[in-house]
């Protein structure tokens, strides 16, 4: 906002250097190319993926476990565990077990059936079959001039806000 007040003709590319977003209050990894980010902020419309954050931990006999440490915004941990358990019972996932070891931090542990299962392929399959990966839609609807609903990009939204603050 300060940048636009000082220099109203600031190009979108400069605004994008300042604004790192999207910023969501919980964890997960935002999957969004720079081109798609530019499109969303220019048009006010688009979508992006949020994947859960995970890592593997080695255990005995060459085995490993997948540990989910962050889940996407507005996703219920219990629902994810239920989805994983259903996939295990329906034999859609090569997992032996899923455990919730969470305390104040999220910790969902996935135990593969054997050590030969590729961890990246396993996680990709979990993302595909559960809410460990979800798609978010962006739709920047605002009341233009306080009256007319309209979909605007980032710069027009900020300009509208600056004009509103000048009037109030």
Question: Language model features by range: what are they?
Answer:
Residues 1-168:
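C-terminal interaction appendages of subunits in large macromolecular complexes
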């Amino acid at each position: 906002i300060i940048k636009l007040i000082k220099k109203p003709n600031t190009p979108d590319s400069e605004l994008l250097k300042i604004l790192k977003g999207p910023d969501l209050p919980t964890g997960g990894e935002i999957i969004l190319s720079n081109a798609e980010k530019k499109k969303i902020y220019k048009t006010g419309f688009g979508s992006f993926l949020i994947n859960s954050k995970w890592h593997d931990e080695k255990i005995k006999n060459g085995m490993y476990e997948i540990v989910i440490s962050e889940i996407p915004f507005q996703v219920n941990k219990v629902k994810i565990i239920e989805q994983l358990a259903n996939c295990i019972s329906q034999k859609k996932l090569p997992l032996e077990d899923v455990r919730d070891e969470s305390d104040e931090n999220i910790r969902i542990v996935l135990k593969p059936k054997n050590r030969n299962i590729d961890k990246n392929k396993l996680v990709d399959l979990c993302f595909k079959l559960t809410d460990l990966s979800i798609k978010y839609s962006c739709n920047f609807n605002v009341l233009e001039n306080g009256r007319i609903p309209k979909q605007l990009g980032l710069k027009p939204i900020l300009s509208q806000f600056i004009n509103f603050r000048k009037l109030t």
